[in-house]
């Protein structure tokens, strides 16, 4: 076996060097060309488009790509290059004519390494993991639409807050209205006390004070009812629209009679005395209210013209009201005479035993008044008999209120809807003028100079 000599190998090497020199007569810069080649190599590896074509002009010291048997990163996450993609890579013409290295948008060169690979894996390429990550990121970035249950709960919370504010506002208004009514009631009590109109021990019973407050509220509500009825009459509404207002006014008088019925059994003297009415109204008071026959006379003046049939019905109702009034007046006068006989009996108190002054406590004053009434030789039977006769006043008060309501219903039946509307408006105007006259008399009448 013959081996080539050393001189032959040297000649072959020199001839090879000469041939390479002849192919590249211009020469190249070793460090710069190597840097550019490495940069292009890593760029192609980052884009996963390795070139399999033979590059025509490569330097001697160019290191070819070798198989990475032990990769530093897992290979299952990176896509496998296809031959079609490898063949599509552009060939490298030469180091002196290559394009410059890729740069970022701001002009700085891209930094290749673990950061770019991690960003590529995070974006996901064309895999399903990237699509899921993109959809998750879009859901996080986009505005969230609440579900119907949350929207319904928010709407319920807003509605509850609105109702709470309305209740608070109504409660504050109610407190303010109650304060005004209480101040007005205190003024009336002081005015009545100054005139010496209190009966008994000089104080109002709790039931009487409650009734006064209820009557004030009823007057305010009745004023609103009549205001609506008056507006409907002035606007010439048809009978179908007037009918509900007329029925409302009629039923509101029933509310007043219910308030009076609750007080009749507890304190009939308060109703009979008329302290809950104005000073001028008390002059026209009849057994705790208005006289039915006088009310019919007032109404007829404001609902004319009437037909003959209506005139006959009105006259009949007026005659029936007067008969009932005469009967009640006779019974009440008989009761008062009987009460006077009991009080003026032989067991009445002597001159040395007088009714206690009002400065005493009510319970003590009541005890002393009972002892004074029975007298030194009297008995408890006379006092009990007088109390029973006072309690019988409630019977007359109930019958008088029943006659008043009966008269109102009779007027409602015999009149048309429009006439009935004018009837209730006229009744309210009548009592309103009486109250205004009392207020005018109290505030404007001249006071005599003190002598």
UniProtKB/Swiss-Prot annotation:
Chain ranges of the bZIP domain: 147-191
Pfam families associated with the record: bZIP_1 (PF00170), DOG1 (PF14144)
Name of the protein: Transcription factor TGAL8
Subunit structure of this chain's protein: Interacts with NPR5/NH4, NH5.1 and NH5.2.
Annotated localization: Nucleus
Lineage: superkingdom: Eukaryota
Phylogenetic lineage: Eukaryota, Viridiplantae, Streptophyta, Embryophyta, Tracheophyta
Gene Ontology cellular component annotations, sorted alphabetically: nucleus
Chain intervals with Polar residues compositional bias: 1-22
GO biological processes: defense response; DNA-templated transcription
Species annotation: Oryza sativa subsp. japonica
